[in-house]
From Swiss-Prot:
GO terms for biological process: cell differentiation; male meiotic nuclear division; regulatory ncRNA-mediated gene silencing; spermatogenesis; transposable element silencing. Residues 1-23 are annotated as: Disordered. SUPFAM superfamilies: Ankyrin repeat, Pseudo ankyrin repeat-like, SAM/Pointed domain. Pfam families: Ank_2, Ank_4, SAM_2. It comes from Eulemur macaco macaco (Black lemur). The gene is ASZ1. Residues 272-334 form the SAM domain. GO terms for cellular component: pi-body. Interacts with DDX4, PIWIL1, RANBP9 and TDRD1. This is Ankyrin repeat, SAM and basic leucine zipper domain-containing protein 1. Keywords: ANK repeat, Cytoplasm, Developmental protein, Differentiation, Meiosis, Phosphoprotein, Repeat, RNA-mediated gene silencing, Spermatogenesis. It is found in: Cytoplasm.
Amino acid sequence: MASGALRGLAVAGGGESSDSEDDGWEIGYLDRVSQKLKGPLPGEEKSETFKKALTTGDISLVQELLDSGISVDSSFRYGWTPLMYAASIANVELVRVLLNRGANASFDKDKQTILITACSARGSEEQILKCVELLLSRNADPNIACRRLMTPIMYAARDGHPQVVALLVAHGAEVNAQDENGYTALTWAARQGHKNVVLKLLELGANKMLQTKDGKIPSEIAKRNKHLEIFNFLSLTLNPLEGNLKQLTKEETICKLLTTDSDKEKDHIFSSYTAFGDLEIFLHGLGLEHMTDLLKEKDITLRHLLTMRKDEFTKNGITSKDQEKILSALKELEVEEIKFGELPEVAKLEISGDEFLNFLLKLNKQCGHLITAVQNIITELPVNSHKIVLEWASPRNFTSVCEELVSNVEDLSEEVHKLKDLIQKLQNERENDPTHIPLMEEVSTWNSRILKRTAIAVCGFGFLLFICKLTVQRRYPNICF
């Protein structure tokens, strides 16, 4: 191969390893675009030449070798066919040529299908989409799973290809299929942080409540992997996207989800999907997509929207019905306010010890809640600023508030120490007061002990007297008592 060519090994798509490590698939491009055969080649040399033509994308040489009698479904050392290799690098023209020559689109190697290989290929979504469409047009089954029970739609979702996902569903792919770990396509998209795929799957009827084998739903998987925007979106109760395209026919779904680019090959369909921002995500979740243009015209950010008052809603042209949806969503997201008003009044001299103890216990519990809340926030905050997904004000504002919090906590600590010293002082004075009257509980306990001991003594004396009486009667039967 010419110097400077890129070299590498073609491996099975989707994480499936091949049965052999030394198959010698070279990925690269020769300096010469095309080669010509100079007469008949021996069988082994012909096979190597065919392999080289595939790796370099030499369509003319591939066609010439096929014309010379080499099988279109030739099996190389680790079992891959030419079509599987072409699909693994998303070479659309090579896939088309091989299919037109009769290559088997339903071939699999150890349950690794050509369609799975195409969905997990290295290449642009446009190329992958075209390859997948060609394979589906030759009746490749979109629901055959690999050894890990992963189907093509799961690989497409995992790798972030929303239009490939849509095309597979349009051809009958089961959107809620689960792999060996209970992951669905939606779970994979949430795990990898592919927002566009999550939205597309919800449109296609994906169930966001299906659990993995360890009991996690997609929103929890997103949270665990620090994809907080997806977590917040999936956590919303309202979801008008779900199932919007579920009842459409295959042709209607393809027409609605995919668009044809007239500037490129018109016989293929590929992606024209536009990414959503955090404001659009929030509005989509509430079924308020119609408000997007209105809010953008007025430069209203998500942060501003979430802090608006009722009069501001009306002033900005937001209807009462839409206001109710937004306020309802805010109630789901806001943290429950600490209700100190429920604590007992302690400023009264006649307060009982039980009431005062109850007050202290509630106060301690509220402090525990505050500590937990801060710990949760620390855990959820991204480590790096570029990972923040929502619009934030200046960090200086947050730092200033945190400084005030620290000051208030220090003041609280000082006051609690004063309270503790006062209670300790009162306790010491009471214990040293000679006029102190024991609590009724203490007196009752003491009296109970005296009565118990007296009763035992009387019973013991009576039993002893009874024994003595029996003994005397046996020895002196004539004596009467």
